[in-house]
Amino acid sequence: MSNVTVAMSGGVDSSLAAYSLLKQGYSVSGITMIFRILFPDGESFLIGEQSAEDARKICAQLGIQHQIVDYTESFNEFVIGDFTNNYLEGRTPNPCIICNKNVKFGVLADHAFQNGSDYFATGHYSSIVNINEKYFIKRNPLDPKDQTYFLYKIRKEILPKIIFPLSGMQKSDVRLEAERANLITASKKDSQDICFLPDGDYRNFISKYISNTDICVSSGNFVDNEGKILGKHNGIFNYTIGQRRGLGVAYSHPLYVSGFNIEKNEVILSKKDELFSESLSASYVNLFADLDSGEYQLKTRYAQKDKSCIVKMTDNKLLIDFIEPIDAVTKGQSAVLYRGDLLIGGGIIDEVFY
């Protein structure tokens, strides 16, 4: 009998994942991570306490062991540091991607394997497929909130040991199955996108994080593409590419954030049509297969529809040419590649070419 550790969030997805594995005859245990956000001034707050309690209860209902692990050090090192530094440097990061790579499918999965688990499972709706002895993550075309964009940085070496018990399902299916199984989490609401932003406001978080430090965030100028001053901004980290609301600049036509000049502490504003770019480069690349000369499907942000592109690899960077221009491509976000529904890999966008 194979041992499987399920990453338990206390939600319906991971609950049904554990239940399904039990029904398939696996020896199942649950694990939940908690962590503290550590602010430079010494203040901290705990994340995951309620999730851990909910996970403990569902594991008790299922009759399986449950373990809580504290990954404060790892989460602050890999996720919070990257998150704040990117925003302060005019980039827009995606912390869930970094967390999946380094924490959930990093130290958490490794902990499971080191303690005797043969497999590590989560409540994703994607699937793991083996094609010619190469393992891929395959997106679920029925899932309107497909999560594979956030999974492209997982180490390919551990894919053979990952199980997604809910592959091919939809949320409505999951809730129905959970109700049939009388799982106590069947009607629990879905979790928020970014776990350490309870109010969803990253600006407040960064302002608090850098308070009482020697990091100085000063106001500067909004400028157009020619450098003409259009108004004052209140700190570069408050803005992202494509942003229109909250600029406080009156002009003859709508203006959007199109770039940053970090050295001059300037936020560049442009017309909508000037947000469209032709290509990008991406670093910190992770690929599940070698690239070829054919077309790939591309996402430059999570909710985006697929865009066609041509890709080549040069000096450990992805150089991606768009078949048609794409708007609001943003440094710090990820360029994620697909071939059909197969996740091929991706990288962090570091340059955008117009």
Predicted regions and their residues:
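ATP-dependent adenylation/nucleotidyltransferase module used to activate substrates
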Residues: 1-152, 173
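AMP-forming adenylation/ATP pyrophosphatase catalytic core
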Residues: 121-354
